[in-house]
């Protein structure tokens, strides 16, 4: 498989890549907002956390409407990890319109959502996306979930996978395969 860092202007390149190399599984992840990776902090120098989060959700929606050659959306609320105030400026309720549009687009396109445990690893206090988003995805009819650890080091492979099943069950998912 492969992870694509979704950027709407690269849609044709992604399609060509996937046609040439028909991977079994493709994660389409959002790493950029306003052309910057939130990891660098630059985007938060000019905009407040809530503005950046909203912008990220809007850009995510644009990307998934344009790019279809992926199976699962990764890093839905990754941006929160790097905000100046992180989760203080974030909740499903604050961004429900934008998040619901993303979730509905995924569901109607037959695409899934990644549960990324790295939010816990980085001290955010929750996995990505937030459990309230997972519950909403399920309420809207979403069924496809993958679990990832966002491991950039060998020791982080499978990080907190032992709690992923219970987390998913608490959000309304009945089946989980390890």
Regions found by a protein language model. Name each.
Residues 34, 86-178:
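Charged catalytic cores and adjacent phosphate/nucleic-acid-binding surfaces used
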């Amino acid at each position: 498989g492969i992870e694509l860092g979704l950027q709407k202007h690269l849609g044709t390149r992604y399609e060509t890549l996937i046609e040439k190399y028909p991977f079994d599984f493709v994660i389409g992840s959002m790493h950029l907002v306003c052309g910057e990776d939130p990891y660098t902090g630059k985007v938060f120098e000019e905009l407040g956390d809530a503005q950046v989060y909203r912008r990220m959700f809007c850009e995510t929606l644009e990307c998934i409407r344009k790019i279809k050659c992926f199976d699962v959306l990764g890093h839905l609320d990754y941006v929160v990890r790097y905000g100046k105030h992180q989760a203080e400026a974030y909740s499903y309720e604050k961004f429900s319109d934008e998040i619901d549009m993303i979730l509905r687009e995924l569901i109607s396109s037959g695409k899934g959502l990644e549960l990324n445990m790295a939010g816990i690893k980085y001290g955010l206090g929750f996995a990505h996306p937030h459990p309230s988003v997972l519950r909403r995805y399920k309420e809207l009819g979403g069924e496809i979930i993958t679990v990832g650890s966002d491991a950039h080091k060998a020791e982080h492979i499978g990080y907190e996978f032992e709690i992923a099943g219970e987390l998913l069950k608490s959000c309304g998912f009945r089946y989980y395969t390890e």
